[in-house]
């Protein structure tokens, strides 16, 4: 299926065209093409080994492609030395100089070096920006992981680059610090308006922070779109499986928009793929548990197997009648349970809305 890019018609700041990178017989990046608008925040999302870090390294000039082209602000930088590309970069490991103070780390790339007063002013400005005022004289060893990453971000922004590259900058931090820095990073990027590309394998991180998400798999771009497009309208089976939780139902085609799952015939709001064997997909939060039975399209009975409280959502495991061997996962808000207490063994009506069902060719693997 062709990758979807809903913003491809807008003006671009960075573009890559048909980039390829091979390491012997292994293809790390295969014909990757992408366009990024000025001021946009884009996340490269995918499993380990999918090519996302390779793509970022090629853009940074830390590696060279075997084929393809990279353009930044209209300038071909495919073979340009890293120092002559207009970007700042933050690594997962911080990469701070342990023998230099915070101020000297941040000012390292500033020129001319003799302008000490100007550099000191810029350092103070950046430390205020990243929430570390008064830290100029400290050394990296005196800072927490989150503070070190703030210093690394300040250093990357010191030269006011047109492009900010982030290589999994939050993955080494604990969950609470990571969530806080994620919010700060998003707010800072919005205020500065700097074009940003971030590599991550954390789908929640990508969906919450990015203007657009680029999902990668096996060296190829599977889909490009807004977080909502990626989550609600996955362009391929891989994207649907990788981003978010899902129910997978093996089905057989019955007509243009009908498919049979066991003894149940379900309607879909869109045409089915041209295949007899199908897999239907629906998110757990889209499964509707009804308070009482009433005959309706895509509505069936299911036995409650398990009820698990999850804070904002309560998770259910349901065994639908007429679908032997299948378990449906549903997520409902606790307020619904206040009106309709559920216990294992109870039979409840369940609706699988036609608008939320999607079909992919082939039998379910999960």
Swiss-Prot record:
It is found in: Cell inner membrane. Keywords: ATP-binding, Cell inner membrane, Cell membrane, Membrane, Nucleotide-binding, Sulfate transport, Translocase, Transport. Its EC number is 7.3.2.3. GO terms for molecular function: ABC-type sulfate transporter activity; ABC-type thiosulfate transporter activity; ATP binding; ATP hydrolysis activity. It is a peripheral membrane protein. It catalyses: sulfate(out) + ATP + H2O = sulfate(in) + ADP + phosphate + H(+); thiosulfate(out) + ATP + H2O = thiosulfate(in) + ADP + phosphate + H(+). It comes from the Bacteria. Belongs to the ABC transporter superfamily. Sulfate/tungstate importer (TC 3.A.1.6) family. The complex is composed of two ATP-binding proteins (CysA), two transmembrane proteins (CysT and CysW) and a solute-binding protein (CysP). This is Sulfate/thiosulfate import ATP-binding protein CysA 2.
């Amino acid at each position: 299926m062709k990758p979807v890019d809903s913003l491809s018609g807008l003006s671009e700041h960075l573009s890559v065209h048909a980039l390829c990178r091979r390491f012997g017989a292994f293809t790390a990046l295969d014909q990757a093409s992408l366009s990024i608008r000025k001021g946009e925040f884009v996340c490269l999302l995918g499993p380990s080994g999918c090519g996302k870090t390779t793509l970022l390294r090629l853009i940074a000039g830390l590696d060279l492609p075997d084929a393809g082209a990279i353009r930044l602000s209209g300038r071909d930088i495919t073979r340009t030395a890293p120092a002559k590309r207009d970007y700042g970069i933050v690594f997962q490991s911080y990469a701070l100089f342990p023998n230099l103070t915070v101020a000297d780390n941040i000012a390292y790339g500033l020129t001319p070096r003799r302008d000490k007063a100007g550099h000191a002013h810029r350092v103070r400005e950046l430390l205020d920006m990243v929430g570390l005022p008064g830290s100029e004289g400290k050394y990296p060893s005196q800072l927490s992981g989150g503070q070190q990453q703030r210093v690394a971000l300040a250093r990357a922004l010191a030269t006011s680059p047109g492009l900010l590259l982030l290589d999994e900058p939050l993955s080494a931090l604990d969950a609470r610090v990571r969530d806080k820095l994620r919010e700060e990073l998003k707010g800072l990027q919005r205020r500065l308006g700097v074009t940003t590309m971030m590599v991550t394998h954390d789908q929640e991180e990508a969906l919450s922070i990015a203007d657009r998400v680029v999902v990668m798999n096996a060296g190829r771009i599977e889909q490009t779109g807004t977080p909502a497009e990626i989550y609600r309208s996955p362009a391929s089976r891989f994207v649907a499986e990788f981003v978010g939780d899902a129910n997978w139902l093996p089905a057989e085609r019955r007509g243009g928009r009908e498919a049979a799952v066991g003894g149940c015939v379900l309607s879909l709001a869109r045409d089915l793929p041209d295949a007899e064997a199908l897999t239907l997909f629906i998110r757990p939060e889209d499964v509707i548990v009804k308070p009482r039975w009433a005959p309706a399209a895509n509505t069936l009975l299911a036995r409650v197997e398990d009820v698990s409280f999850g804070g904002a959502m309560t998770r259910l495991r349901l065994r639908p009648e007429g679908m032997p061997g299948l378990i449906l996962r549903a997520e409902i808000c606790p307020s619904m349970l206040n009106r309709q207490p559920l216990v294992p063994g109870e039979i409840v009506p369940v609706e699988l809305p036609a608008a939320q069902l999607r079909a992919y060719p082939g039998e379910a693997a999960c």
